[in-house]
Amino acid sequence: MRGPREARRGSLLNEPGLIADGSVLIRDGRVEEVGPTRRVENLKAARGAVEIGASGRVVMPGFVDCHTHLAFPPPGLARTDAASALNAVKTSTARSLATQMGNCLQAMARHGTTTVEAKAACWGGQSAGLKLLRALSLVNHDPVDVVATLLFCLPARGSGPDGAEAAVEWACEELLPVLARRRLAQFADIEWSPEASRLGPIRRYLETAARLGLGCRVHADGDGPAQAAALGRELRVAGIDHLENLAAGELGGVAASGPVVTLLPGPAFHRGSRPAPARALLDAGAAVALGSNFNRSQGPILNMQTVVSLACREMGLTAAEALVASTINGAYALGRASTAGSIEHGKPADLIVCNVSDYRELGCHSGMNLVHLTMKRGEFIYQEGAVAPLAAERLRLAW
């Protein structure tokens, strides 16, 4: 997947950089060389290397899931019940929350994800988000890399402009400085709201986060996504996410914007609603990434293979576009393109071996795990296990 040093757009999304009969030479957890097998195996550095066969399988970069809500309250509570969710977080220990998150990360690793963005929501004036971020810090690199994001949610509509201004005032003066100082998050995200009275607070939040050295994202899952993209382009945010409500006449402005557009086919499939206009965005020149939006209430899918399949079936992406969008473009959305998303010389050896003979088969299956091996920094963190037959005496049925 070598290519330009920027997120892929247009025809480049259909060029995954395939190598037929290829090999990867790994040394000290990093890619030493990648290319045709005949050339790689004749390198002096390859002498004495341990060979791991992958004949008949596809070797590809580990998935980069660039949009999840991994840092959610304990099971059984949705964000719609904000008071109960906040209380549950407050009464839980960071360690117990970390255990819950760690279990999800292990499941992600089994399904081929090696880098994941994880949002911790903060509902204005509450510090529960800090505890969720502390819990995330306990599970980073175990077993995958976690890019922590604070998602700031403005007060409910109808609370008036003063409510939004007061919430952002608190976030800018107290919350964001703590995040930056303690390095609890790499990104600051904010839920988009198109009301004129809220544009000022949203702008202030993003500008303050950028000034403190945090990356910025915009959560545009409601009305007015084109306005969100315009502000994101102006402020040079890293990504604009969701965009399910984007109108046809707004495609050009969004596609021309600098930020990577992260699309989420899972929630639309789960709810039976209309997904974002992915095909139109791609044709208009947008740099598109794919994320799972994993959370228990609205998107209980953490398998990026399923996300790829849904993107092909429900959004009209080609298999190549979905592959690029779920790896290197996801890495660009997270500012991790130098360390994730492709198999290139010098990059960490984050890769997966899949039980398919052609990468295009990834878009033909849904709800399956096609991953045979998952490697993180040159170490296997997951290996597919054999299904052992049961002894005959254990197969006797009792009637």
List PLM regions with ranges.
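N-terminal metal-binding scaffold of metallo-dependent hydrolase/deaminase domains
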Residues: 1-43, 361
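Histidine-centered divalent metal-coordination motifs
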Residues: 67-71, 191, 219, 242
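Metal-coordinating catalytic core of metallo-dependent amide/deamination hydrolases
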Residues: 85-102, 106, 114-227
